């Protein structure tokens, strides 16, 4: 996603951008890389760095072409003079000339704490409940989410689907079990159940784009929001199917069976 932001700001094809994974020890103190804040905040920093980079490149291009920097316009990786059309330089040209023009051009971007950009989501689910065993089967699942702007729609769709599956796990399966003496009884993934591909249907996603007021492109965080709606959506669907309202998690077959027995159904 950051690669796409840089390519957009620099006006070049994404294949021209390479991303190096840095060591966080080499940068200043910041908050954690989480909380659905990465795309929202980091894209702002990338945007700043690219803007500064183009400013420095404009000055070098102007010196090389012997024109005023304000005379140059930039488009798709090319600086050209508004006055003399034959005066033009590509980013490739500037790169080749960098050693005799002061070395490689570097620019940085940084953001302080930004105003929150809340994300909104609604999930719709159809379930089938076995009234004898309490087993819940998901038939259809659709997730709607306002993402501000989907810079990389494929990744956004994957995040929404992954978050929904995590929420489904919390709602129907996942929960620690302790003995009377406080010993954890399901400390491995054999006993601690999580959803697999056989437990969930294909999750349809509907991406809504209502830009946030802060940050480039109106981006909003995506990753955490889809985790929450599955819990009330499934609780409501189960209630609609059985008449039983479950108020504790997980809503597994045992819990649902006992709830239906307690209701007398």
Describe these PLM feature segments.
Residues 4-265:
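C-terminal catalytic domains of large/alpha subunits in multi-subunit enzymes
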């Amino acid at each position: 996603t950051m690669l796409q932001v840089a390519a957009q700001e620099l006006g070049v094809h994404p294949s021209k951008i390479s991303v190096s994974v840095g060591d966080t020890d080499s940068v200043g103190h910041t908050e954690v890389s989480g909380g659905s804040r990465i795309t929202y905040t980091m894209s702002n920093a990338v945007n700043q760095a690219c803007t500064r980079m183009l400013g420095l490149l404009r000055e070098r291009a102007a010196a090389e072409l012997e024109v005023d920097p304000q005379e140059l316009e930039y488009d798709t990786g090319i600086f050209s003079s508004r006055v003399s059309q034959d005066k033009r330089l590509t980013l490739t040209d500037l790169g080749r000339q960098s050693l005799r023009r002061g070395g490689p051009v570097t620019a940085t971007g940084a953001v302080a704490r930004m105003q929150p950009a809340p994300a909104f989501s609604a999930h719709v689910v159809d379930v089938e409940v076995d009234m004898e065993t309490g087993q819940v089967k998901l038939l259809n699942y659709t997730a709607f989410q306002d993402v501000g702007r989907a810079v990389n729609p494929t990744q956004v769709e994957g995040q929404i689907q992954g978050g929904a599956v995590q929420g489904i796990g919390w709602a129907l399966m996942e929960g620690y079990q302790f003995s009377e003496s406080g010993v954890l009884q399901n400390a491995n993934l054999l006993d601690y159940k999580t959803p697999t591909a056989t437990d969930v249907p294909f999750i349809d996603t509907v991406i809504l784009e209502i830009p946030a007021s802060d940050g480039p492109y109106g981006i909003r965080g995506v990753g955490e929001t889809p985790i929450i709606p599955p819990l009330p959506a499934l609780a409501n669907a189960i209630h609609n199917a059985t008449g039983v309202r479950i108020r504790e998690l997980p809503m597994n077959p045992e819990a649902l069976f006992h709830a239906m027995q307690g209701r007398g159904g």
